[in-house]
Amino acid sequence: MSWGTELWDQFDNLEKHTQWGIEVLEKYIKFVKERAEIESNYAKQLRNLSKKYQTKKNSKEEEESKYTSCKAFQTTLNEMNDYAGQHEVISENAASLITVELTRFVQELKQERKQHFHEGRKAQQQIETCWKQLEASKRRFERDCKEAERAQQHFEKMDADINVTKADVEKARQQAQIRHQMSDDSKGDYSSVLQKFNREQHEHYFTHIPGIFQKLQDMEEKRIGRMGESLKTYADIDRQVVPIIGKCLDGITKSAESISEKQDSQMVVESFKSGFEPPGDIDFEDFTQNMKRTVSDTSLTKADSKSDPKVPSKSRNKLWPFIKKNKLMSLLTSPHQPPPPPPASSSPSAVPNGPHSPKQQKEPLSHRFNDFMTSKPKMHCFRSLKRGGSTPEDFSNLPPEQRRKKLQQKVDELNKDIQKEIDQRDALTKMRDVYTKNPQMGDAASVGQKLVEIGNNIEKLRVEVQKFEGWLAEVEGRLSARNDSSRRQSGLYDTQNTQTVNNCAQDRESPDGSYTEDHSQEPEVKVTPTEFDDDFDDEEPLPTIGTCKAIYPFDGENEGTISVTEGEILKVIEEDKGDGWTRIRRSEEDEGYVPTSYIEVYLDRNAKDS
């Protein structure tokens, strides 16, 4: 079936149809282009989503990523990132294999179609020209025939008329002959033009037009075939990434199967186990001992003389597992809230926290830790209680078990660093030997300098390892000793559970390094420093860096503050660090923070510089 023979008279319809075919192809190209944009945007959004939920370095999330469930989630995010990459592949292949190629093909198609229809119109113009020539020749032949017939009739009429002269008859006869000759010439010309037209028309409808229409048919079939191939390519582009997407999904499934509930539970134990033993039973407190006390027995409560005598002092049994971890530390650091503004007048009633405002019964800071300071033991973590303090190098601020793990981790890291330095030293040693044998390859002296530097680094790292291994051995020894001690104390509690409060005020070590005692009613117990070797260390008090004069009275009710009276002279041991508080000392053990705006500070420059 050929368009040239079947559609020889459908030139205009074929022109419209081929134009429609090109428009369909352009519509498909536009569809693929928009699909590629969607895939690209989708891949970008997936990557951003995966990046958004990735574990941030140097954050709490990085510490939590050790759990199997978190690892599985991170694996899922990584697989989704690869999954997004496959959608990018779809977008890129659709653009390069379909959009670009079909756009070029459409341009070629338009050019070819234009050329074919130009040839068709040219053939039509040619046949139309021949037709016009035929019509003109036919009309001329018809006109000449009529003119010859009229001339013949005129001659016959003149010849039959006896009144007409012979000359007029001859003239009419000649005129008729001329007209007959012209008619014969027109007839010959018309016959020639007609033959030519028939020949042109035959070539037009049986040669030119079929050839042009066949080319149009081939062009259209090529367009249709190319679109079919493109649709197949469209499917193949997606099919090619299906195995990789399947692997991504398999990775997610595998990570989900790797989640271990028991392992995560064990990690929680390893992360938060303190190494302390649970507290023993609380002993009975015999308050009838107050009736047997003498006047000298109550001398221990002299430190509470500043408290309101109407408010009875209550004994507090504080069990360390139920105390906030930073409770003790907050007592020795500056208050978290901003200091109160200075009063408008020096009247005590105008001072915040003055005597006219409701007050909460509070023991002075030095009295709170009276028993702690008896033998002058101080906690290791006191070193870091200054504002802006950092974690101690020996991790003494951590519970024993966590401290042991941190120290072990530090030792392992240092050993890895040492191994790296040793490997680098071995490589440089070989390089130096090569340079020594072949000086043209490099300078052996420069390598020797690097070897000296690496040797120094190794020595420093080994010193660090010995230091941390010493702390680690110390912690491990204390943990084993504490376990033995706890077993002995468990038997002691069973035999002494009926003792009075004077015999049952046993110190307990808390996870944050603090100890809890009941010292409100028993005589002062002298504690030797060896009992607190696990978490305390002797440290000299802060030196005095100046003096200050209180210009307003301040009744320190918050933890870590100290009360002062107007005009009182005190010692400054720590400057204002920008938070509005200054640390001062009244006596050896009575110190705390007051608002900087409530005092006039006179710093000793020599002490400050030293």
Swiss-Prot record:
Domain F-BAR: 1-264
Site (Mediates end-to-end attachment of dimers): K166
Keyword entries, A-Z: Cell membrane, Coated pit, Coiled coil, Cytoplasm, Cytoplasmic vesicle, Cytoskeleton, Endocytosis, Lipid-binding, Lysosome, Membrane, SH3 domain
Region (Disordered): 295-319, 331-364, 383-418, 478-544
Gene3D superfamilies given in the database record: 6.10.140.470, Arfaptin homology (AH) domain/BAR domain, SH3 Domains
Residue ranges that the Swiss-Prot or TrEMBL entry lists as coiled coil: 67-259, 392-484
Biased composition (Polar residues): 488-505
GO MF annotations in UniProt: lipid binding
Residues annotated as signal peptide: none
UniProt domain REM-1: residue ranges: 397-474
Main location per the UniProt record: cytoplasm
Membrane-protein topology: Peripheral membrane protein
Compositionally biased intervals (Pro residues): 336-345
Gene Ontology BP term (one): endocytosis
Domain SH3: 543-604
CDD domains noted in UniProt: F-BAR_FBP17, HR1_FBP17
Protein role: Required to coordinate membrane tubulation with reorganization of the actin cytoskeleton during endocytosis.
Protein family per UniProt: Belongs to the FNBP1 family.
Assembly information from the UniProt record: Homodimerizes, the dimers can polymerize end-to-end to form filamentous structures.
Protein name according to UniProt: Formin-binding protein 1 homolog
Species annotation: Xenopus laevis (African clawed frog)
